[in-house]
Amino acid sequence: MTATGLDRPFDLLLARFITTRPMRILSGLQPSGRLHIGNFFGMMEAALKLQHEGEAYYFIADYHSLTSIHDAKVLRENVRELAIDFLACGLDPEKCVFFRQSDVPEVTELAWILSTVTPMGLLERCHSYKDKVAHGISASHGLFAYPVLMAADILIYDSDVVPVGRDQKQHVEVTRDLAIKMNEAFGEGLLRIPAPRIREETATVPGLDGQKMSKSYNNTIQLFEEEKALKKKIMGIKTDSTAVEDPKPIEGSSILALYKLVASEADYDVMVADHQRGGIGYGDFKKRLLQATWDYFAPMRARRDALIADSAYVDRVLAEGAAKARTIARATLTRVRDAVGLG
């Protein structure tokens, strides 16, 4: 080592890590089709709060989507829809970095390097592979090695925190294992070891039939449903046969559960009281839910219309986000390449 201390990448690495910076938070979003309100209240709302907590990086996981989407037109449309929807719902490019995963190709090279230290048994123990195959997704190497690419997604941005649901905690644990293996093999401190932040489980958002809202059950209300379609769906929510004059059950009411998400606390309390008192039919409650849902998403709907009309803005946001992300990714990949002997 010379007096400059720059002959080994780890000296630069140590200096960089000692430098304080805001907590870096990473969140990946799969472009799997049109979003519904279950997605919004179950995932999007929490994800949007991250941009106020630190240095937030959001990416659209289009590489990952190739394991289940084999139609180029559909994938492009899904990516576009997701970008527009997240921006419409409040993602602020001035407060976060928002980009397409595939616009940062360095992540695939890091994934390959990580794969060389990944034990087969580690991947075989991942429940996500078995779960997805059980749900009809064709078994493939990409699906099997999914956790390695996810680890590369996390590690290439020196992420500190990765918010995940409890069902995805294992993916962050795999990432930590691989980072530790790389550090042990090629130099302590080579890769930052991230920590999972387990999202508090939100209440299950009920679908039109009372089951959990899911595309699999064909019971969803799309996030930006047209007014006529929204009315048809909400007025068609399944209810019991309680007579108009009788009190309505509170427990298990899909109408009340949905109304609580979109109405003010005061309005929700009024609807609960009206259920308990009786004398009001389900049709009236559904109309209140319809109006509250339409009003709740009105500002987002207006922003979405503006974004659709200004496609150049959306392109610019994604391009600028990718440029920022690649700056970090290139630095990480350079030090990893040097450490393993490729530099």
Regions found by a protein language model. Give the residues of each.
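Conserved nucleotide- and phosphate/pyrophosphate-binding catalytic cores
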Residues: 20, 170, 176-343
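N-terminal Rossmann-like or analogous alpha/beta NTP/dinucleotide-binding catalytic cores
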Residues: 22-152, 305
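Divalent metal-coordination and catalytic microenvironments
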Residues: 114, 167, 325
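Short helix-capping/linker segments at secondary-structure and domain boundaries
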Residues: 120-124, 156-163, 263-271, 301
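Internal, conserved structured core segments that host functional sites
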Residues: 137-182, 186
